[in-house]
Amino acid sequence: TLVKSSAASDVYKRQVGGCAAQKDKELVRERAPWVDVVIGTHNTTDVINLLNQAEDWGPITEIIEETTDIETEIAAVRESSVSAFVTIQIGCNNSCTFCIVPSVRGIEISRRPSDIINEIKSLAHDGVKEITLLGQNVNSYGRDLMINNRRKPYFTELLYKIHDIDGIERIRFTSPHPKDFKIETLKAVADLPKVANQIHIPLQSGSNKILSSMHRGYNQKRFLEKVDLIKSFIPNVSISSDIIVGFPGENEDDFQQTMDVVNYAEFDLIYMFKFSPRPGTVASDYVDQFVEKEVIDERFMRLKVRQTEISEKRYKRFVNTDQTILVEKVSKKDNNILTGRIEGGHIV
């Protein structure tokens, strides 16, 4: 990432951070010795200070192995002058075999509601109109804060509190885990005008065999029940998803089951990924089950073509309708050309 060390500076510094840096700091330095700052997942709020130090002292690598202070790990990220991402939770208690997050970020830690509310109020004061709540599994937010009341859907309560903040006009959240998606959350999305009618629900695969190998904690039937529930509660909802193509052991029948879910659910958008073994994950050890690259590429293209057809069909429902657009960018070449998103997250 290119980052200015200060607002007044015209000099950009190079910074690498996140899960990969947390796990493989030596490898990052070996491959990119010219990077000014390498940080992990536990001290992202220190990046500006470290960049300033690097300007005086040269390249810095600072990896903190563990922290119990979530406030040192997060900072609001502005997508534009009117939109910001707000982290409500770090870490993950799940054990998906393709994911490195639990081993490098640790267990789930929820921010205190008061800290979240105060940050969003500050953002609203600065002119931010839209906030996106971030967490590895937002639906489990607050479980660690409510030890004696684990059944309470605290994420839903948080949505109601944020909805009452003056100045904030649109609220989004990502990512929920299908197995933890509660009906109370859907009711909140339906009841609260500021909460966008957009739901991201990661599928990863439509095959029960592959879902089990991934340790996802749900099967195809349960996932589709969640999709049906979402559509029943939220009129004109826009649903997006994640799919991994070519997970170890995936055969043609497994892939076809994924396509069956795609055809049934009719997602507005899919974030598609070709499986690649990530060192340190369980799935990276499934070497004898790896799918050939040519097969992955062919399946990926079939999925892409089909989803393009579905997306075009879904987008046509907006023709001749009035939509509220939050303008995020003005063209540098023509001030009359604006870019923004409607409530469902579609770019116009």
Task: Say what each PLM segment does.
Residues 6-141, 154, 184, 199, ...:
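Proteins enriched for Cys/Gly/acidic motifs involved in redox and nucleic-acid/cofactor modification
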Residues 285-348:
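Terminal RNA-binding accessory module
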Residues 96, 116, 133, 173, ...:
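Conserved, mostly hydrophobic/aromatic
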Residues 253-260:
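Short, acidic/polar
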Residues 1-2:
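Short, well-ordered junction/capping motifs at the entry into regular secondary structure
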